[in-house]
Amino acid sequence: FGKKVDVNSFSGHDNDYLSLINDKRTIPLTYNHKARYVNDINYDIYRLLNPGEDASNEKIADIMPYKNRLHCFKDKYYKLIPDRPSRTITAHLRMDCHSHIHPYQIRAITPREAARCQSFPDDYFFLGAYLKTYMEIGNAVPVLMAKQIAKIIKQYI
């Protein structure tokens, strides 16, 4: 695939959701699973927040870069809650992923993880510039939702 797509091995279905989005297929490789660089300030913020906590948390008040603008950046930093639905995946992830901090690791979600939230199968890969993949994923209609809408429309055709 060249230098634009990261390829990782994958051992199979970890849960029912992965089985569903992959149509019960075992997919040996995943694509676009590379985390973004995290600078020192964001590393500390990511480390200090617990799942479900955001930029308004007192633990990060002294290092929060947007503390004087919390009224407009209150959702700037958010650590996802494990085993709960994700926040909405948006094209803004192209700019930064602070609104989707991984619940266990000190990093933001990868394009592959964002694509999984949008129900893209693991063998779907995004070509092109790394940050563009976040925009493509954020602008997409979730695959499973599109399938359900198509099923209903088909009944009336």
Task: Describe every region a protein language model picked out.
Residues F1-I157:
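C-terminal target-recognition/interaction regions appended to catalytic cores
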